[in-house]
Amino acid sequence: MFAKHRRELATWEYKVFLVALVVMFLHLTEDTLVHEESGSSVGAKVGATVLNLLLAAVGAALYPVLRRRVRPLLVLAYGALGLLAGWRAHVTDVLDGDAAGGDYTGTIFTLAGLVLVALAVKLAVDALRDRTAPAAP
């Protein structure tokens, strides 16, 4: 199983996916711990941080073991999460001139989501291209 992870780590697509996951994790954790988005109790902070870590770890672990045709769906799910949540919660505040604290990292979080959506499209096109490519003689 780890051989698949090592093999995928050589591809730029997996590296981009991992970097975007790290950006998303860092923003979500910063929102949780610094800006207290999930409440002020220690239990709420620890719980939210563990869920953030779990969200990133599941994506990083699943990507290499999924079939090439299914990977775009995983990447699109993470990208849509980042793009939509980041846009609604942070980018609108930046555009309105009301940005504070986590809105700046939230904008980077949104850009990571946009990168993942573009990566999902690229992976889907590659999967379709491989599917329709004629067999070599």
What is each PLM-predicted segment?
Residues M1-L21:
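Cytosolic juxtamembrane helix and N-cap/initiation of the first transmembrane helix
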Residues K15-V46:
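Hydrophobic transmembrane helix segments
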Residues A3, A57-L73:
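Juxtamembrane helix-break-helix junctions at the cytosolic face
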Residues E37-A48, G97-L111:
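Non-cytosolic membrane-interface motifs at loop->transmembrane helix junctions
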Residues V50-G59, Y63, L116-V117:
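Hydrophobic alpha-helical transmembrane segments
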